[in-house]
Amino acid sequence: MAGTSLGARFYRQIKRHPGLIPMIGFIGLGMGSAALYLLRLALRSPDVCWDRKNNPEPWNRLSPNDQYKFLAVSTDYKKLKKDRPDF
């Protein structure tokens, strides 16, 4: 057991306990979904500023028609009018 690799030990445990396969699948799916959501937040959120020199306040460049929420049920962003001054 001391000389076996981690993959071989994992495969042996899965072979002994096949009921763990769905749990490992759901945990992997949850971790993958969480990683993709964090990536979406980092790249699409107006609150995140990656370049402070050229774009110090990225939220000021948003127009009212930009949808940055993950899910907007009752808001139609195409019908909104601009009510803010330009910066």
UniProtKB/Swiss-Prot annotation:
Signal sequence residues: none
Pfam families assigned to the protein according to its UniProt record, in alphabetical order: B12D (PF06522)
InterPro entries, alphabetized: B12D
GO cellular component: respiratory chain complex IV
Family classification: Belongs to the complex I NDUFA4 subunit family.
PANTHER family, sorted: NADH DEHYDROGENASE [UBIQUINONE] 1 ALPHA SUBCOMPLEX SUBUNIT 4-LIKE 2 (PTHR14256:SF5), NADH-UBIQUINONE OXIDOREDUCTASE MLRQ SUBUNIT (PTHR14256)
Name of the protein: NADH dehydrogenase [ubiquinone] 1 alpha subcomplex subunit 4-like 2
Lineage: Eukaryota, Metazoa, Chordata, Craniata, Vertebrata
The encoding gene: NDUFA4L2
